[in-house]
Amino acid sequence: MSSPLQRAVGDTKRALSASSSSSASLPFDDRDSNHTSEGNGDSLLADEDTDFEDSLNRNVKKRAAKRPPKTTPVAKHPKKGSRVVHRHSRKQSEPPANDLFNAVKAAKSDMQSLVDEWLDSYKQDQDAGFLELVNFFIQSCGCKGIVTPEMFKKMSNSEIIQHLTEQFNEDSGDYPLIAPGPSWKKFQGSFCEFVRTLVCQCQYSLLYDGFPMDDLISLLTGLSDSQVRAFRHTSTLAAMKLMTSLVKVALQLSVHQDNNQRQYEAERNKGPGQRAPERLESLLEKRKELQEHQEEIEGMMNALFRGVFVHRYRDVLPEIRAICIEEIGCWMQSYSTSFLTDSYLKYIGWTLHDKHREVRLKCVKALKGLYGNRDLTTRLELFTSRFKDRMVSMVMDREYDVAVEAVRLLILILKNMEGVLTDADCESVYPVVYASHRGLASAAGEFLYWKLFYPECEIRMMGGREQRQSPGAQRTFFQLLLSFFVESELHDHAAYLVDSLWDCAGARLKDWEGLTSLLLEKDQNLGDVQESTLIEILVSSARQASEGHPPVGRVTGRKGLTSKERKTQADDRVKLTEHLIPLLPQLLAKFSADAEKVTPLLQLLSCFDLHIYCTGRLEKHLELFLQQLQEVVVKHAEPAVLEAGAHALYLLCNPEFTFFSRADFARSQLVDLLTDRFQQELEELLQSSFLDEDEVYNLAATLKRLSAFYNTHDLTRWELYEPCCQLLQKAVDTGEVPHQVILPALTLVYFSILWTLTHISKSDASQKQLSSLRDRMVAFCELCQSCLSDVDTEIQEQAFVLLSDLLLIFSPQMIVGGRDFLRPLVFFPEATLQSELASFLMDHVFIQPGDLGSGDSQEDHLQIERLHQRRRLLAGFCKLLLYGVLEMDAASDVFKHYNKFYNDYGDIIKETLTRARQIDRSHCSRILLLSLKQLYTELLQEHGPQGLNELPAFIEMRDLARRFALSFGPQQLQNRDLVVMLHKEGIQFSLSELPPAGSSNQPPNLAFLELLSEFSPRLFHQDKQLLLSYLEKCLQHVSQAPGHPWGPVTTYCHSLSPVENTAETSPQVLPSSKRRRVEGPAKPNREDVSSSQEESLQLNSIPPTPTLTSTAVKSRQPLWGLKEMEEEDGSELDFAQGQPVAGTERSRFLGPQYFQTPHNPSGPGLGNQLMRLSLMEEDEEEELEIQDESNEERQDTDMQASSYSSTSERGLDLLDSTELDIEDF
């Protein structure tokens, strides 16, 4: 008789075998049902709510529910005599092929000739010519349908658009403006040029003599209000370019009117005898004609502005919004008399808050064109007072190109509108000079220059050329630069400030004569901090001029320098070297006592053209420098100073230089001095059991100096290995050697071994040499192993780092590349050493992570440094694992801390896991299981089997198992055998220990099945059946079974039930049409769909959800929180990265649970029902969007956290009279 456990497993198996997945896919529809604009003013910004419309949301929300179903838009005011007739049969004659479209697409012929050719054909047959133009615009939208002469004569615009909408190709989301491929690359430019040329060629005749411009505008207006994105995008572009061309025509008419008025006044003011009445009459007739033309053009512009712009500037598609803003900026610049008013400026101001980068960028660029003209700034005062705060805040925009343009806009405001930017506004820009993005930092540097430096150090121009700056002006510049750097307390590195100012003030920063004169001046009034800053500015400027690239952390994005830049760089390098070679010894002599100042001065040598020491006959200055270098090395023991000194001497000790012998002699003299001191001090240490503090300090300082030079120079001939080993052996045996001495001694022995290996690798070494080196290396490893148990933490960590590096160097990798003769040097650590390394890792790396503060306090800096040191230790251990030095099973000690220490070491552990899987997929999977087993066993030993799955530690283990499952990625078929193997071995472990005979307790390891359930979403349907059978077979060996199923078994069986594999039962989470609208017009990517399925597969255990239904999804809501947690923590959802970022916020509102539509897969009208649903999305979702999007869409616009109050909260602004003008919308 089967037990209850076996019955539970059997029930699950039957449910699994009987399950079947069903899915429905929607036909693609490229229509945007919520494209936001209606001619009657009842529209609402569906996807781009901005703060200026908050006061209108409530009213629109009420109207939205009562709005009738959307129909194809019609012209608001049909022109008298327009073509409005009844519908007729769809059988119509086909017009000839549209050669106009093909010619514009090819973009090979002259556009003016093309337009003239079309105008000739239009004059011969106006109806056919205009029909060809209409079909050109239709074909430019990507529509395969055409307008026939019968349609043209008998149907209205709205009926034509409705007919074309029904014929629109829905198989692809591409249309000419966005289509990929070289043939469409230049189409948009040719299209815009055609519209411009058309108006330009018609402006003197056809534009006023019967050309049906009103019909064309009416057609474009109707198309711009279409639900089809291609119609809306293309027609909006055409309408806005048409408007721009008409604005230029209106401007010319305005000029002609002014000229006519002047001519009329001049003629009328003539005397009676000189006045010509015919001339006055002709001028009056010309004025009347110009006024009529002006009224016609203004009527056209008004129709385009009110019919297209006021609806499309807030369209759901960002490309359309960007077109509108770009063009209105052109109108304001070219025809400022009519368009540069607050009633038009408000649209740019409101759109500054747009969610998309491209739209904000167009806004800022449009404003740059306005503020760049000083004559126009007087009309911008009201706008500036209203939107200045927003423009200043855009300096911190999350998109760098927008932030760069925002800073440049503020520069124009600073130049052309005095007193507008307050000190607080400017102080919000100053920190940006230290930004990591060089373009942004350079723009902020230019702002800083014009605000602080230019007024005091104005460059006087004469004859268009700059005069040489006076010493007083340069001194003022450097004093202001020092004041800003020191008093602002924004940053500690002058290199970033110099780089930011380089493009605008490079000539001043390259005044090395002025810098050195300030530093060497005896009666200077510079403080210690100012001297250090000035030296850092000098070195940063020299490095920038000689190397030509920004400091670490800033990337220009440029691949290389131009020939002109390389020549300038070479000239600057020579100029710098010739000036500083005589002065560098003087600077070192003056500041040799200060380590902070002497270190950057020693680094100056890397900026020199050292050949000038020879060609310029400056050897005497070389001798002075070498003397000062020796004094600095003997005087200091700080690592930074010693490293800089050793590197400077290394640059001079190049055998290619003619002065090599002098530099080599100075090096030998210095090392001899240090070695003699070391031998004397070491002898005293070995003979005496006690040393005072001065003796310890002197010995440690000498060892540090030797260690710094041994790192850069080959000091093998001084034979420092043996005395250092004696010192370390005494430290290990007696423990009487101070730790200050042990640390540099360990480093010295390490460098000695590496330099010996370098010599042996370059030539065929004898067996004796190889054996000697191996003995030294093994002896040093034993010393380091002994130091791992030292009481001093610094010694332990130093020994671990050196030991890790040596084991890696002498690993089997050293014989790769034809160096098989080094095989005797290959070393494998013993098991005891491997165990000690792992134990060290547990004691020093995986300790309780501390919360880092703001980073400003000294304690926070120390904590960050300690974290970096721990990361270095972990990285060394992981490299030993991946290169086969340590047993791969030791990786379980690392992987089991993956989740707990994710914030500190997550990137390192993830990379180790990825590399380990590449080496051996099967073994890596077993290591993951081993990590879980070890954690489970530790928890079991600590707390016992009772209530184990309710402990917080067990919940953390489940999170770790979930993260392990996610690390398998989307290759479900490739990892199939691994996941099945992991489940089987996990089941074996859970039942490996059984309770005593007669006991009713569950096996102690049974709760491990709950951890295995996290891997169940990675299984295929067939594998779940096999695993259920395997579990049932294993349970038969359980002697005593309770009267009810054990909880872990029930949970595990439930994870193998059919409701878990949502990726198989519901291939799409979002309907096709919805996903298309969210993601944009691009074609659906099969990889994106696959990644979406995989994400659904592994993140939840939700029952299969039929498309467009609302089921029990909401009851499982907590599991969706897991996805957000994984994304915030940076989980391994690598396969989900291919999905578009845009629309992620809105996708929460577009899920199937929000549609209460009955789902009947077998119903005959499903396709039509879904089509109607996709066409009426706006009506169904408007309530949700009104309530939720207005607060969500603006959250990520800027990097800084800022919120914008609604109109009702902040009161009416200065533009309220226009903002609340509903008729304009």
UniProtKB/Swiss-Prot annotation:
Gene Ontology molecular functions: chromatin binding
Biased composition (Low complexity): 15-26, 1090-1099
Biased composition (Acidic residues): 45-54, 1177-1191, 1216-1225
Keyword field: Cell cycle, Centromere, Chromosome, Chromosome partition, Disease variant, Meiosis, Nucleus, Phosphoprotein, Premature ovarian failure
GO BP annotations, alphabetical order: establishment of meiotic sister chromatid cohesion; sister chromatid cohesion; synaptonemal complex assembly
Domain SCD: 309-394
Biased composition (Basic and acidic residues): 1078-1089
Entry superkingdom: Eukaryota
PTM sites of type Phosphoserine: 1203
Compartment(s): Nucleus; Chromosome; Chromosome, Centromere
Biased composition (Polar residues): 1198-1209
Family annotation (InterPro entries): ARM-type_fold, Cohesin_Scc3/SA, HEAT_SCC3-SA, SCD, STAG
Tissue: Testis specific.
Biased composition (Basic residues): 59-69, 76-90
Region (Disordered): 1-97, 546-567, 1063-1113, 1177-1225
Assembly and binders: Component of the meiosis-specific cohesin complex, which also contains the SMC1 (SMC1A or SMC1B) and SMC3 heterodimer. Such complex likely contains RAD21, or the meiosis-specific related protein REC8. Interacts with CCDC79/TERB1; recruiting cohesin to telomeres to develop structural rigidity.
PANTHER family: COHESIN SUBUNIT SA-3, STROMAL ANTIGEN
Family according to the record: Belongs to the SCC3 family.
Protein name in the entry: Cohesin subunit SA-3
Native source species: Homo sapiens
Gene that this sequence comes from: STAG3
